[in-house]
Amino acid sequence: EFYTYPSPNFVWQHDMSPPSEKFLDTKTNEIKKISIVPKPKQSPHPPIWQVVDGARSIEWAAQNGLNTIMWIPTVKALKKRFEIYRDAKSKAENRDVPLGEGISLVRDMFVAETMEEAEKMAGEHIINYMKWVCHWRGLGNHMDPGEELPETKHKLDLLNYNFLHKRNLLFGTPEYVVNKINELKSELNLQNLQVWSNFPGIDHKACMRSIKLFNDEVIPKINLDSSDIEKAS
């Protein structure tokens, strides 16, 4: 929904603040000065990151100078989205925008000493969370371009750890997670990655252990300029 401020036919009425030419056109009742208080430190405002998924929202963000955040899709599906943003931003700014610029990717992450331990400690919790998310979305966002899933009685019958893990999870050993992140860097020229380990139901100590392993064993081995990396917290 979109709103107009002030509303049509607005008339300023305030006992403690009478109409003034300083902020109001007293003939038309048009407010000339209206702003957010307190104002942002950065001018005109901090960089804005818009959550996007469909082509229309991706293009709109690029055309209006907004950065974007993406989450669930597979690498192949993300490639198309990254290209849509790059092409729209290049046209809007009249320059060759490199793939990956202005995009941040969110990935669910859980690092453990073994692949089996990662699944045991966090697998059930990420699936339960995804059942809640996908109750509304279905599984379409998890599919590769052109992929067709077999028909099932219920729309989430295929949703299990094996289905999810290969598509978009950074779950496993430090070495596995490093390789998956480097794949994102190689295929998408990924420049911004956000990770999340605190899924509903997960043990707090396990979550903190995952984050520590990510900071200590994953970040130092990612093929990124270390000056651009902030540790997970």
Model features per residue range: what roles?
Residues 48-51, 66-70, 101-108, 193-195:
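Hydrophobic faces of well-ordered beta-strands that scaffold small-molecule active sites
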Residues 212-224:
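Alpha-helix-loop-beta-strand connector modules within alpha/beta enzyme cores
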Residues 72-75, 196-207:
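Glycine-rich, proline-tolerant flexible connector loops at the mouths of alpha/beta enzymes
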Residues 1-39, 76-190, 223-233:
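An alpha-helical appendage that flanks or caps ligand/catalytic pockets
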Residues 111-115, 203-213:
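Short glycine/threonine-rich loop-to-helix capping motif typified by GTGT followed
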Residues 53-76, 81-82:
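A conserved active-site cap/scaffold subdomain adjacent to cofactor or substrate pockets
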Residues 40-47:
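A local structural motif
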